[in-house]
Regions:
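Conserved beta-strand-loop-alpha-helix junction that forms the acyl-donor binding cleft
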Residues: 90, 119-130
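Short alpha-helical
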Residues: 10, 80, 126-127
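Conserved acetyl-CoA-binding loop-helix of GNAT-fold acetyltransferases
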Residues: 95-108, 130-134
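A short, well-structured alpha-helix characteristic of acyl/acetyltransferase catalytic modules
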Residues: 1-39, 155
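Alpha-helical elements of Rossmann-like donor-binding domains used by nucleotide-donor carbohydrate transfer enzymes
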Residues: 13-17, 41-44, 48, 101, ...
Length: 155
């Protein structure tokens, strides 16, 4: 059964593993691909995203039974004054519907938390645009590099 799990510091090995995996991080190819996430960064990261999120950040692992299969998050972009979504499925688990289910759960939680709209910047060559459109997001803007998608949670 798919659920969202709040990771403890000792669970961040999975985030490190995903961020170090070339296939999982292929969506980030324009910015260098993989991102180091050594254990020395875990405490500060956990403090900012989990402990002291100030209502401006939300982060969970996607868990199917006892296996971590990805992550979902949203955060408030101060510069643009919008909430940005993050959905990453660990490469071995892609194509099994986890992204769609997790994005739907994330939207429900954001709505429960009083958020009216969610956005994401998706690279123009990233196939996840389809996922967002199927989950009710609409294209808000397009450039040569990325597509900004938006979903209204309150009508």
């Amino acid at each position: 059964m798919l659920e969202l799990y709040e990771p403890h510091i000792e669970d961040l090995w999975f985030k490190e593993k995903m961020m170090d995996d070339e296939h999982t991080m292929a969506y980030n190819h324009a910015y260098g691909g993989t991102i180091p996430f050594p254990k020395e960064k875990w405490t500060n990261w956990h403090q900012r995203w989990i402990t002291d999120h100030s209502g401006k950040r939300f982060y969970r692992y996607i868990q199917d039974n006892d296996a971590f299969v990805g992550e979902v998050a949203y955060y408030f972009d101060e510069e643009r004054q919008i909430y940005i979504v993050d959905v990453v499925i660990y490469a071995p688990y892609r194509g099994k519907g986890y992204g769609r289910k997790a994005l739907q759960l994330l939207c429900e939680i954001a709505k429960e938390n009083g958020i009216k709209e969610l956005y994401d910047d998706i690279a123009i060559d990233n196939s996840s645009v389809e996922l967002f459109l199927k989950c009710g997001f609409e294209e808000a803007m397009r450039s040569n590099e990325y597509i900004l998608v938006k979903k209204e949670l309150w009508n």
